[in-house]
């Protein structure tokens, strides 16, 4: 099941890229998905993934949550320049952010998305599913972003779609590699929790906060509430 939903998540990247090359979409559409995803991901991490990590691995799980958080920080800010959603439409920014570098950074990011999905399914179908939903909500924005970057750098529409597809492949690799390491679940699950917190709190929320108005901010809380309601319905 993890592999199947990994394919669906990867398709989200590709679909986001196709949307960009077919027509111009308003930025608020992208931010709505990011806001929902940020709230939902934080709720998943703190109410499901971290408690389950502690149940399996004890108090030592918190160390691996921290390692997961800073592992993504290392890749995004040191090994590859950090890229902000929305910069892709500015030609001047493209002089400083080459498409290949952005693709590498987002590729690392999406690889860890796959790790999180697979680690969740190694624990239970419920946990894997809620993590998948959290990640899928920001798959479209990822595809939007990389396709826009490639187009803004002067490359063809075909290459823009291929770049979005490459992010999908990275997601699948994360799913498959983690699924082969079931014995390391006590480490993989808290690592995925740290990755989830990083993506939601450090990547998505700051971009949501750049958007003026109350609607986008409200969607963060809608994301949190949707998971809490789902938990209540499933566990009653």
Task: Describe every region a protein language model picked out.
Residues 1-236:
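Intrinsically disordered, metal-sensing/regulatory segments
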